[in-house]
């Protein structure tokens, strides 16, 4: 990557815009592609993303564009911040242009029909590309406002991790590296489900003990499932696991938390998602995760409970009663029951 070669950011949402700004602040020329030409033009003229990141000035080094072909041709390092439902359809027609390039997924979601993570879809589309993921406790607005933040870039290609660290690491944004791409990406995708539960709990006035129980049991469920899929359990003790889970389950800025809060106030799922105006990946992830957990026989009572409320007509009180009656098992599943080797 030469000094003047632009880095591409695909997606016009809040996180893509925040990352584009970070890159530009580090002196990297950025082309931010979005599907909507009107949005691209408005961002070029007004130097702001009013739809998704209102009040944050778009750095002069970010060029909003609508020509995907030219963007892919011009860039060797490409950050992909597309919704999970759109990633395959947007990039598959341009597979040849991705050959040999560095693709870093920013999307925390799972493809519904295949239960594939975004990096796995990128591998299918561009098997000769180097693939990585970026995930962690990263609320887009706080990043854009320069709150002190840390994230994890994960890839089996160490040089890709170093490349991402070189362009993104800055005075308010620390980038750590990991080789556990699958674990880091699963942490980012799974925690969205539990953020919905946390938002509901706050709206219903549940106590601090309850919220703490939900977050820690959520971490146990996430880790249990991820280990069944081949991830390293220790990854979930870091930024991409417990770090991301805490911020997403605690902050009203989290989209999935907002959906849960609205549900707890008595809104329907359709109303809660519609009012949000952005994609809440947790709703889609919940559906496929419930099915997958049953297939691989992984015990995930919080996932099953939320699914019962949103899609099976159960009430919250019914689900809580069922959860509290369930047999208590081990606290941490990947160590022996006694805690000793």
Curated annotation (Swiss-Prot):
Active site: 191 (proton acceptor)
Entry keyword annotation includes Lipid metabolism: yes
Gene3D superfamilies hit by this protein: N-(1-d-carboxylethyl)-l-norvaline Dehydrogenase, domain 2, NAD(P)-binding Rossmann-like Domain
Predominant place of localization: cytoplasm
A GO term for molecular function: NAD binding
Keyword annotations: Cytoplasm, Lipid biosynthesis, Lipid metabolism, NAD, NADP, Nucleotide-binding, Oxidoreductase, Phospholipid biosynthesis, Phospholipid metabolism
Database matches in Pfam families: NAD_Gly3P_dh_C, NAD_Gly3P_dh_N
Top-level taxon: Bacteria
Reaction equations catalysed: sn-glycerol 3-phosphate + NAD(+) = dihydroxyacetone phosphate + NADH + H(+); sn-glycerol 3-phosphate + NADP(+) = dihydroxyacetone phosphate + NADPH + H(+)
One GO term (biological process): glycerol-3-phosphate catabolic process
Enzyme Commission number: 1.1.1.94
Enzyme class: oxidoreductase
Residue positions binding NADPH: 14-15, 35, 108, 140, 255, 279, 281
Pathway where this protein functions: Membrane lipid metabolism; glycerophospholipid metabolism
Family assignment from sequence similarity: Belongs to the NAD-dependent glycerol-3-phosphate dehydrogenase family.
Protein name, entry field: Glycerol-3-phosphate dehydrogenase [NAD(P)+]
Lineage: Bacteria, Pseudomonadati, Pseudomonadota, Gammaproteobacteria, Pseudomonadales
